[in-house]
Amino acid sequence: MKFTFHVSPSIKNNLSTQRIMKELSLSLLVVFVAAVIYYASAWGASAALHCVLLLACSLITTFVCESIFAKIMKKDVKTFLKSSFGWVTAIILTLMVPVNMSCYAVIIATVFAIVLAKLLFGGFGQNIFNPAAVGRAVILQAFTGVSVGLITQATPTTVIASTYHWLPSNAAVLDSFLSQYGGFAGLALGTYPGSIGETFSILILIIGVVLAIRQIIDWRVPV
């Protein structure tokens, strides 16, 4: 009997980590650009620019934190940044905060997300918590009152949870709720304020389907 030995992986997949993260990053940026366009048309250029500024703050903070970590660990900074995919965490975190969040709150949240929730656990693929979710938790606990005064309106999720306890009692109540946000069309198209990346639901669903078809994500997880 003849045995053949070869190094792992024994099962190969054409989907590389680099490709998966690049396509995911592109998808997230599509959502971000759509949000910027909405805020520019509905709330003016200052709101749109603030969205871009929040993303820039998160990205710069991410690269600074990961560069310092790479230096401390005596790793090549450029190689580490390319393989750490920290920008994905920065984009997701930015999409999870409201447009009226202050920049310094996003910077602090990014430090917690990158350093405490990711790098200290070993970096990409080793963290036990979602870094962006940790950053959002920091904002919710420590910076809920910090904003720049662009938007103060309640989002649909907060209204339906606090007012209707997630279940409108009848059709009239449901119509009253929907009218605040332009009906089902308004909810689908995201024509209301909220977290930067949460409102354009129809676009998010379309991107999710595309990513599932391309096998970038497993459709069973979001479903």
Question: Positions of the model-derived regions?
Answer:
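A generic, well-ordered mixed alpha/beta core segment in the N-terminal half of proteins
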Residues: 85-156
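Short hydrophobic alpha-helical membrane-embedded segments
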Residues: 20-28, 79-89, 106-111, 182-183, ...
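Long hydrophobic alpha-helical segments that form multi-pass transmembrane helix bundles
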Residues: 125-205
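Short, amphipathic, aromatic/basic-enriched membrane-interface segments that mark the entry/exit
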Residues: 14-20, 70-82, 100-101, 189-197, ...
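N-terminal signal-anchor module of multipass membrane proteins
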Residues: 1-63, 67-70
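C-terminal ends of transmembrane helices
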Residues: 5-11, 62-77, 114-125, 206-215
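Structural signature of hydrophobic alpha-helical transmembrane segments
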Residues: 47-61, 100-109, 192-201
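Hydrophobic core segments of alpha-helical transmembrane domains in multi-pass membrane transport
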Residues: 27-37, 58-66, 93-95, 111-115, ...
